[in-house]
């Protein structure tokens, strides 16, 4: 088992730090239909709990997570294919879904022709919460996504918070 997977929190109560951002994330998912923005961008350094928070929420609340790593699907066609499939398919076990797009800052390379714009257009139509993670939102190619999303900041964990998690 990979070390990071072994020590990854499985429940929200196991996540250290970033309590306010996690609380706002939970509110967004639970009240998705009432939010004016249909997506959230979780911004913070690697290891701050962005992706773990989504999976812990899903585990506790019986949601299915459909994950796309943006660095693997960079162009318009591949993003449209994933999003259309995710938005239109029913869960095998009739669970509610979360669409997680990890590392959207990976969309800023030369091969990413139209990827961010396609994603921005599709996420407005989603019947499911779209959650994106990023280390940096200052990239100009992501401005359309950032404007259409609620942004929640995650701070780096302190050494004592990391110690609590490992202890």
Where are these regions (language model features)?
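Short, conserved catalytic or adaptor-binding loops enriched in Gly and charged residues
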Residues: 5, 59, 144-147
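Walker A/P-loop
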Residues: 33-68
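Short amphipathic alpha-helical molecular recognition features
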Residues: 3-7, 13-20, 46, 70-75, ...
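Pre-Walker A (pre-P-loop) alpha-helix and adjacent loop at the N terminus of AAA/AAA+ ATPase modules
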Residues: 2-39, 85-92
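Residue-level signature of catalytic and energy-coupling elements of molecular machines
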Residues: 15, 58, 162
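Short, well-ordered alpha-helices that flank and scaffold nucleotide-derived cofactor binding pockets
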Residues: 27, 55-59, 121
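Non-catalytic interfacial helical region
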Residues: 64-167
